[in-house]
């Protein structure tokens, strides 16, 4: 008969230990969520809010739509001519002159590569150990 209470006590300890183990497994990792590949890129785009820019452009366009509703058709043709001439001018200039690239950038190709290295490091760490939303938002 002494075996029965001991067996029940052992069973109770085993159930409580199993429940405790399940609780620790269900908790989020202290490093955040593990994201690899496409999931990481999607999380960066979602966190940085790429579509927010398009929404703000559309709202600004709708707000200005009523202001320019009574323009004449001659202005449209003048705008087309101006765009054609600016496109022609863009083709005649070098890309550095047209875009205003600073000459120092041409001498240091590694300077632009630094941000890619940060992205690669964070993406590999996020895949291995997980990362938080604040770490992902540091890329914005």
UniProtKB/Swiss-Prot annotation:
Keywords: Cleavage on pair of basic residues, Disulfide bond, Hormone, Secreted, Signal. This is Relaxin-3. Residues 56-116 form a propeptide. Heterodimer of a B chain and an A chain linked by two disulfide bonds. Its main location: secreted. One of its GO terms (molecular function) is hormone activity. Disulfide bonds join 36-127, 48-140, 126-131. SMART domains: IlGF (SM00078). InterPro entries: Insulin-like, Insulin-like_neuro_ligands, Insulin-like_sf, Insulin_CS, Insulin_family. Belongs to the insulin family. It comes from Sus scrofa (Pig). Pfam families: Insulin. It comes from the Eukaryota.
């Amino acid at each position: 008969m002494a075996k029965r209470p001991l067996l029940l006590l052992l069973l109770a300890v085993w159930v409580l230990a199993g429940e405790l183990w399940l609780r620790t497994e269900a908790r989020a990792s202290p490093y955040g969520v593990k994201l690899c590949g496409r999931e990481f890129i999607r999380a960066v785009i979602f966190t940085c809010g790429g579509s927010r820019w398009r929404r703000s452009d559309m709202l600004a366009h709708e707000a200005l739509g009523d202001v320019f509703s009574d323009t004449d058709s001659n202005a449209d043709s003048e705008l087309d001519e101006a765009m054609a001439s600016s496109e022609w001018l863009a083709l005649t200039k070098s890309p550095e002159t047209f875009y205003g690239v600073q000459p120092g950038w041409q001498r240091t190709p590694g300077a632009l590569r630094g941000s890619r290295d940060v992205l690669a490091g964070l993406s590999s760490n996020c895949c291995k150990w997980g990362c938080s939303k604040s770490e992902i938002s540091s890329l914005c």
